[in-house]
C-alpha cells in the first residue's frame, strides 16, 4: 500500500459524514425529481389529504400521472351505464297496451255498438285477455274484430261472433251446463266460463287440445272441463246441456248433439257448405222431447266440422 493511500485509512469520523460521491448520486433523473418533490409535498398537506368523495372528482398531485387508478380511480360506481333502449322500450309498451283494461273496453264498446246488449256477455268479453290465446306475432291484433289463425288450419273466431253466439245461447237465462264443440285455443271456453256454472269443451286435434290447456292454466278457471275427442259425437256422459255452441260448420247439425240438448235448451251453430259462401248462423231450440225449432240468422264463415280425432 502506498504512503498516500495509507494516510486515508482508517477513516476519521468526519470522513464518514461527508456528501456522497458523484457516482452515488447518478441513479437517474426520476429519483432526483422524486427526492426534491418530497419536501414540497410536505409543505402542502392539503393537496394530499383532500378526499375524493367531497370534491366529486379525483385530483392528481403535480408531477404525477393523473390517470393511474392507484392514486386517482375513476368513480365508475357513481355513474352507472344507462340501459340500452333498443329491446326494453318497445316490449313493455306493447305488453301494457295489450293487457290494459282500456284496450279490452274499447273492444267491448264496439261489440255494444254492433248490437250485443247482454251485460253479462259484455263483462265476460272484457274479463278474458284475448291476447293470451293467440300467437305472439299476432298479439297486436288480438283485440281487433278479426279471426286469427291458431295453427292446424284452425282459427280463433272474431270477438263479435263469439259474443253473438254466446248471447244467443243464453237468451237472458242463467246457464248451468254448456257444451262447446271445437275448443281451439280455448278462448271461447274462457268467455263461457264467466256466464255458465260448468263448461265442457271438446277438441279433436290433439295439439290444439294441449295448447288450450296451457292457455287456460294461468287463468285458473275452475269450471272448464276439456275433453279430447270427436265433437260430432258430443259428450253423452255429461248431458243434458242448457246450451251447445258449435265452433265449426257442418252441412247439418249432428243428431247426437240435438239429443244431448235439454228441453228448453238452445244450440247455436254455423250451418252450410264447406266453401263458406252459404254458411248461416243457426239457432236450434228444443221445445219437446222429439221436437226442435230452427231459426236461420246471420251469414258467417267457419272452418269445417269434421269427424274423428287427429
Curated annotation (Swiss-Prot):
It catalyses: [protein]-L-isoaspartate + S-adenosyl-L-methionine = [protein]-L-isoaspartate alpha-methyl ester + S-adenosyl-L-homocysteine. Pfam families: PCMT (PF01135). Gene3D superfamilies: Vaccinia Virus protein VP39. Residues 1-46, 60-79 are annotated as: Disordered. It is found in: Cytoplasm. Its EC number is 2.1.1.77. Residues 14-34 have a biased composition (Basic and acidic residues). The keyword Transferase applies. One of its GO terms (biological process) is protein repair. Keywords: Cytoplasm, Methyltransferase, S-adenosyl-L-methionine, Transferase. PROSITE patterns: PCMT (PS01279). The active site is at residue 157. InterPro entries: PCMT, SAM-dependent_MTases_sf. SUPFAM superfamilies: S-adenosyl-L-methionine-dependent methyltransferases. The keyword Metal-binding does not apply. One of its GO terms (molecular function) is protein-L-isoaspartate (D-aspartate) O-methyltransferase activity. Residues 35-46 have a biased composition (Low complexity). GO terms for cellular component: cytoplasm. Catalyzes the methyl esterification of L-isoaspartyl residues in peptides and proteins that result from spontaneous decomposition of normal L-aspartyl and L-asparaginyl residues. It plays a role in the repair and/or degradation of damaged proteins. Belongs to the methyltransferase superfamily. L-isoaspartyl/D-aspartyl protein methyltransferase family. This is Protein-L-isoaspartate O-methyltransferase. It comes from Burkholderia ambifaria (strain ATCC BAA-244 / DSM 16087 / CCUG 44356 / LMG 19182 / AMMD). The gene is pcm.
Amino acid at each position: 500500500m502506498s504512503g498516500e493511500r495509507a494516510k486515508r485509512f482508517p477513516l476519521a469520523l468526519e470522513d464518514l459524514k461527508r456528501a456522497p460521491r458523484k457516482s452515488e448520486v447518478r441513479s437517474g433523473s426520476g429519483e432526483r425529481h422524486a427526492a426534491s418533490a418530497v419536501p414540497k409535498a410536505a409543505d402542502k398537506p392539503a393537496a394530499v389529504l383532500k378526499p375524493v368523495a367531497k370534491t366529486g372528482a379525483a385530483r392528481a398531485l403535480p408531477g404525477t400521472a393523473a390517470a393511474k387508478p392507484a392514486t386517482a380511480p375513476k368513480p365508475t360506481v357513481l355513474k352507472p351505464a344507462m340501459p340500452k333502449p333498443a329491446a326494453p322500450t318497445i316490449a313493455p309498451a306493447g305488453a301494457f297496451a295489450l293487457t290494459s283494461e282500456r284496450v279490452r273496453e274499447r273492444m267491448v264498446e264496439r261489440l255494444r255498438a254492433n248490437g250485443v246488449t247482454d251485460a253479462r256477455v259484455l263483462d265476460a268479453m272484457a274479463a278474458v285477455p284475448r291476447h293470451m290465446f293467440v300467437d305472439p306475432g299476432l298479439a297486436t291484433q288480438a283485440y281487433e274484430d278479426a279471426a286469427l289463425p291458431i295453427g292446424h288450419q284452425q282459427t280463433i273466431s272474431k270477438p263479435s261472433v263469439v259474443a253473438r253466439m254466446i248471447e244467443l245461447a243464453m237468451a237472458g237465462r242463467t246457464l248451468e251446463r254448456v257444451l262447446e264443440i271445437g275448443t281451439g285455443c280455448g278462448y271461447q271456453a274462457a268467455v263461457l266460463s264467466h256466464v255458465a256454472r260448468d263448461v265442457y269443451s271438446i277438441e279433436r286435434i290433439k295439439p290444439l287440445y294441449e295448447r288450450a290447456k296451457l292457455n287456460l292454466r294461468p287463468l285458473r278457471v275452475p269450471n272448464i272441463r276439456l275433453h279430447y275427442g270427436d265433437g260430432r259425437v258430443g259428450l253423452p256422459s255429461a248431458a243434458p246441456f242448457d246450451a251447445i255452441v258449435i265452433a265449426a260448420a257442418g252441412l247439418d247439425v249432428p243428431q247426437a248433439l240435438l239429443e244431448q240438448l235439454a228441453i228448453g235448451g238452445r244450440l247455436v251453430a254455423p250451418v252450410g257448405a264447406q266453401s263458406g259462401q252459404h254458411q248461416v248462423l243457426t239457432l236450434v231450440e228444443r221445445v219437446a222431447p222429439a221436437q226442435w225449432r230452427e231459426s236461420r240468422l246471420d251469414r258467417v264463415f267457419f272452418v269445417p266440422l269434421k269427424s274423428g280425432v287427429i
